[in-house]
Amino acid sequence: MPNSEPCVSPLELFNSIATQGELVRSLKAGNASKDEIDSAVKMLLSLKMSYKAAMGEDYKANCPPGNPAPTSNHGPDATEAEEDFVDPWTVQTSSAKGIDYDKLIVRFGSSKIDKELINRIERATGQRPHRFLRRGIFFSHRDMNQVLDAYENKKPFYLYTGRGPSSEAMHVGHLIPFIFTKWLQDVFNVPLVIQMTDDEKYLWKDLTLDQAYSYAVENAKDIIACGFDINKTFIFSDLDYMGMSSGFYKNVVKIQKHVTFNQVKGIFGFTDSDCIGKISFPAIQAAPSFSNSFPQIFRDRTDIQCLIPCAIDQDPYFRMTRDVAPRIGYPKPALLHSTFFPALQGAQTKMSASDPNSSIFLTDTAKQIKTKVNKHAFSGGRDTIEEHRQFGGNCDVDVSFMYLTFFLEDDDKLEQIRKDYTSGAMLTGELKKALIEVLQPLIAEHQARRKEVTDEIVKEFMTPRKLSFDFQ
């Protein structure tokens, strides 16, 4: 809602959001054009931001506003916090620097991954911390100290992460949780379960069941190409595994019984027009957090804690999971949260597989990578070479530099690039060239590994079985 209309009441805003939400859903259901849907979604986000600015809290479906919240939060640094919008489906901010993650930690009630925790992980594993930890890419956690306590006392835990297979080709941003999860599996030597939520994508997207399942299998090949240990990793499709495992389905039903419709409406913004499959799906994403969902691996034990590496937008699912866990007699899962991988056009939103120009795909050729980076990567450089040499570039908003923080292993080289670009010694074209030289071999090597993943290997990873780990 434009700022020039201060007469609009919070209740009117609330009703406008509900109406706009219905419009978005009807456009999606009616297979409207992408531009039309995107425009409606942007209007919905704008209305929600205006509501938060007026009320001091997020919009919640079926919770009409009472009196407006105090306006003391409208200070000089309030704007970015009010304009950050994060949920499992949408990530949006007006800041070129991206989401304010410190404020997101406060809003979500998680804990910052500080130097002390990173040092403790290093002591426990005897390994140098992964660059994602060193650089704050994994920046937030829930109960990681508890996992380390268990590990140091020789008590087991397992890893759980996942992928929503919405397309055949994955982009480089999708690799982030898997690169880090592989490192965790290697340094802690623990089993891993990977959920492919093909059922979710069928419910949310215009896909057939067969398409959703085929995407799950194709995406599994990219995940396997990250190098996971076949003896310690189980990848499963929800559409497959739900019918195979009574332990998994029993946990889904337990969770469903202990979470109300009102709770999921408050957490996820569901409305009366959403299909019942969407409303019950969070229980399916929650169930792998409990070890007896995998009796073939954990022998019906219920006391083995789970550690979930994921992007911060998935946290609402696991806040719900952690809330319900003690009520059904299970330990709460621990979490490690990552930042978002920005779109080529800037950090205002995360990279999307639906927009080919916003993404570097794992199927892209060396030429396509070069063209996309040179043509579309948002620059923090100046308008002219003379100005850039004099004033330097801005690494905080430059997408090429952001990508290097994810993929360039050498800390010293990254710091030198930062200094050279900030001082003006390095030009935007040179920075983009440095990124291209990192991305091209990384993706070519991934493609070579993926070619070696046969249908038989996928089947073995996706077959329920005992893993090579002895739980005492």
Swiss-Prot record:
Top-rank lineage group of the source organism: Eukaryota
Domain WHEP-TRS, first and last residues per copy: 9-65
Chain positions of motif 'KMSKS' region: 350-354
Phosphoserine modified-residue sites: 352
Localisation: Cytoplasm
E.C. number: 6.1.1.2
Chief place where the protein resides: cytoplasm
SMART domains (UniProt xref): WHEP-TRS
Catalyzed reactions: tRNA(Trp) + L-tryptophan + ATP = L-tryptophyl-tRNA(Trp) + AMP + diphosphate + H(+)
Gene Ontology cellular-component annotations: cytosol; nucleus; protein-containing complex
Single Gene Ontology BP annotation: positive regulation of protein-containing complex assembly
Modified residues (N6-succinyllysine): 155
Database matches in InterPro entries: aa-tRNA-synth_I_CS, aa-tRNA-synth_Ic, Rossmann-like_a/b/a_fold, Trp-tRNA-ligase, uS15_NS1_RNA-bd_sf, WHEP-TRS_dom
Entry comment on modification after translation: Proteolytic cleavage generates 2 forms; T1-TrpRS and T2-TrpRS.
Pfam families: tRNA-synt_1b, WHEP-TRS
Keywords assigned by UniProt, alphabetized: Aminoacyl-tRNA synthetase, Angiogenesis, ATP-binding, Cytoplasm, Ligase, Nucleotide-binding, Phosphoprotein, Protein biosynthesis
Residue span of motif 'HIGH' region: 165-174
Gene Ontology molecular functions: ATP binding; kinase inhibitor activity; protein domain specific binding; protein homodimerization activity; protein kinase binding; tryptophan-tRNA ligase activity
NCBIfam families the record matches: trpS
Subunit structure as annotated in this protein's UniProt entry: Homodimer. Interacts with oxidized form of GAPDH.
Function: Catalyzes the attachment of tryptophan to tRNA(Trp) in a two-step reaction: tryptophan is first activated by ATP to form Trp-AMP and then transferred to the acceptor end of the tRNA(Trp). Could also possess an angiostatic activity.
Protein name as annotated: Tryptophan--tRNA ligase, cytoplasmic
